[in-house]
């Protein structure tokens, strides 16, 4: 897609959660037709899409069939639990997979993206090792020093992750990783525990033609591997930002294609001596980047769609301090409702997005509060207050 093409275009989303919903809205504003695909009916992007399809996303034949039936101009993976081998086949047939089928395959496996970053590109990462049994995990963890972080090589949203304080916790960590892992392989990555001052996402935009662009860095807090709040712009020194941008450019150049990537880093070390450490990468809009709906002239979703379609991005501009705070469910329920919107939306410079998920479970992200402020502190306080006002009701 290196030359101008007529509109409307047809985009297929593989994964139709809250991030896919915002991609669909951004695409439709440009007159595009959107096909939303997911494993369950009523996924957030489906009500706003032109067509909805429900398939087993890890079933290669089902994935090939739905893509060939619609033959979209662009296929945009929005989740990690996909039949990636089928994407490679479809790409070979001429289907435009975003950013590339290889990028999707590499980044869904923590071992492959870590080997690329640390081994192939020489980026600074936490010290790490792999293990394929509890016994091997114990042997691999000890040289890293305690505590260590254990993660399945394939999982999402923090599933299966744990911090292990010493040898006595290895068996439980292995069991947790296997329970939270995706796929059939029994493999984990074990990392040294980094005592970091800040965790950031650098949204990186690769264009078909034109330079790689960067959004202002986003600070965020995670619990159990899942995003809880984010703010923009995060405060980094000029040198630190330059290092992060160089790392992000190196890894996204290697993965190729076009679109927006969420590249995560840790900032570690004594004040004034912090170093930037590569953590992970998603080849798609990032959950921490929901804050860009309040904090930028073009949100991460607008940027992704423009980059994918080869449209110009003249400027990425901050609109001032902005923050987000997630709205979580606390119980399991087949139906949900909400109260407290009046209280939440009374917070100045705030907005609330409810994702429209059809059911709830403890810890499931049901919405997000966004806010702007004169300062980052004020923006974060407003986002927190707005989120606290919304209550997820799981019974009538």
Q: What spans do the regions from the language model cover?
A:
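ATP-binding N-terminal substructure of ATP-dependent carboxylate-amine bond-forming enzymes
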Residues: 1-108, 112-115, 135
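Active-site nucleotide/adenylate-binding loops and adjacent lid/helix of ATP-dependent enzymes
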Residues: 106-201, 205-224, 228-251, 383, ...
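Short beta-strand micro-motifs enriched in acidic
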Residues: 205-207, 266-270, 355
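Short, solvent-exposed loop/turn segments that connect beta-strands within catalytic domains
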Residues: 210-211, 269-275
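Active-site "cap" helix and flanking loop/linker of ATP-utilizing ligase/carboxylase catalytic domains
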Residues: 242-263, 282-334
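A short beta-strand motif that forms the metal-chelation/ATP-contact edge
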Residues: 274-284
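Peripheral (often C-terminal) accessory segments that flank ATP-dependent C-N-forming ligase machineries
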Residues: 306-396
């Amino acid at each position: 897609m290196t030359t101008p093409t007529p509109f409307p275009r047809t985009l297929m989303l593989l994964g139709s959660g809250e991030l896919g919903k915002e991609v669909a809205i951004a695409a439709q504003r440009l007159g595009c037709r959107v096909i939303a695909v997911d494993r369950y009916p009523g996924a957030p992007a489906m009500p706003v899409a032109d067509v909805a399809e429900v398939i087993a996303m890890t079933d290669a034949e089902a994935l090939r069939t739905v893509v060939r039936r619609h033959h979209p101009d662009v296929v945009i993976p929005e989740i990690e639990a996909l039949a990636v081998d089928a994407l490679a086949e479809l790409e070979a047939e001429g289907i435009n997979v975003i950013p590339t089928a290889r990028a999707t395959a590499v980044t869904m496996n923590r071992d492959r993206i870590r080997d690329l970053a640390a081994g192939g590109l020489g980026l600074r990462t936490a010290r790490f090792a792999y293990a394929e049994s509890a016994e091997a995990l114990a042997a691999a963890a000890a040289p890293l020093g305690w505590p260590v972080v254990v993660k399945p090589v394939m999982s999402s949203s923090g599933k299966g992750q744990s911090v292990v304080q010493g040898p006595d916790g290895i068996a439980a960590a292995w069991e947790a990783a296997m329970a939270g892992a995706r796929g059939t392989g029994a493999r984990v990555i074990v990392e040294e525990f980094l005592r970091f001052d800040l965790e950031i996402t650098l949204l990186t935009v690769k264009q078909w033609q034109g330079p790689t662009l960067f959004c202002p860095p986003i600070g965020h807090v995670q619990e159990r591997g899942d995003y809880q709040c984010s703010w923009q712009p995060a405060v980094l020194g000029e040198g630190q930002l330059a290092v992060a941008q160089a790392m992000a450019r190196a890894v996204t150049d290697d993965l190729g294609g076009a679109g927006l990537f969420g590249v995560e880093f840790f900032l570690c070390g004594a004040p004034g001596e912090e170093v930037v450490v590569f953590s992970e990468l998603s080849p798609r809009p990032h959950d921490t980047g929901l804050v860009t709906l309040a904090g930028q002239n073009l949100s991460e979703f607008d940027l992704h769609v423009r980059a994918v379609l080869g449209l110009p991005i003249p400027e990425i501009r901050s609109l001032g301090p902005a923050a987000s705070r997630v709205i979580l469910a606390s119980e399991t329920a087949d139906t949900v409702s909400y109260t407290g919107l009046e209280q939440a939306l009374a917070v100045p410079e705030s907005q609330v997005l409810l994702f429209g998920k059809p059911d709830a479970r403890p810890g499931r992200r049901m919405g997000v509060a966004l806010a702007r402020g004169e300062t980052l502190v004020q923006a974060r306080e407003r986002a927190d207050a707005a989120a606290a006002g919304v209550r997820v009701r799981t019974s009538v």
